[in-house]
């Protein structure tokens, strides 16, 4: 699973996800992409599940690009621990995704296979998404 090799600080504030994506809203690598419509934190496990769903459906043909990286630490306290006594330890890593962000790109497969692969990937994610296609010049 994806996670940073090292970070400047171990823990972060929760923060909020406001506004639209400033960058990463266009297709850069592939012909088909999966674009977020809602703001949400996507965990490394969800990214990996979506990647596996796509590559399995494509039968390891074509190419997949993951355009988001889980760089936000999410902390959690152990089960049945009372409130207080400091912040919990890092439990998982997540990527903050704003509306309009392209999360995955696909190339090297035909239209039907690409759309179905992205639909399967979208089912693994906790947000509404849209399949986008690069217009040929």
From Swiss-Prot:
It comes from the Bacteria. One of its GO terms (molecular function) is rRNA binding. One of its GO terms (biological process) is translation. GO terms for cellular component: cytosolic large ribosomal subunit. InterPro entries: Ribosomal_uL16, Ribosomal_uL16_bact-type, Ribosomal_uL16_CS, Ribosomal_uL16_dom, Ribosomal_uL16_sf. Keywords: Ribonucleoprotein, Ribosomal protein, RNA-binding, rRNA-binding, tRNA-binding. Coiled coil: none annotated. Gene3D superfamilies: Ribosomal protein L10e/L16. Binds 23S rRNA and is also seen to make contacts with the A and possibly P site tRNAs. PANTHER family: 50S/60S RIBOSOMAL PROTEIN L16, LARGE RIBOSOMAL SUBUNIT PROTEIN UL16M. Belongs to the universal ribosomal protein uL16 family. Part of the 50S ribosomal subunit. This is Large ribosomal subunit protein uL16. The lineage of its organism: Bacteria, Pseudomonadati, Pseudomonadota, Alphaproteobacteria, Rhodobacterales. The gene is rplP.
């Amino acid at each position: 699973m994806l996670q940073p090799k090292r970070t400047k600080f171990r823990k972060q504030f929760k923060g909020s996800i406001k506004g639209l994506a400033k960058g990463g809203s266009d297709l850069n690598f592939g012909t088909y992409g999966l674009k977020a419509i809602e703001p949400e934190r996507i965990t490394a496990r969800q990214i990996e599940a979506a990647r596996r769903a796509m590559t399995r459906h494509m039968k390891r043909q074509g190419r997949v690009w993951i355009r988001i990286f889980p760089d936000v630490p999410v902390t959690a306290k152990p089960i049945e621990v009372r409130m207080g006594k400091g912040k919990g330890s890092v439990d998982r890593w997540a990527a903050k995704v704003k509306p309009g962000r392209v999360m995955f790109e696909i190339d090297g497969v035909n239209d039907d296979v690409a759309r179905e692969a992205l639909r399967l990937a979208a089912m693994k994610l906790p947000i509404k998404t849209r399949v986008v296609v690069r217009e040929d010049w």
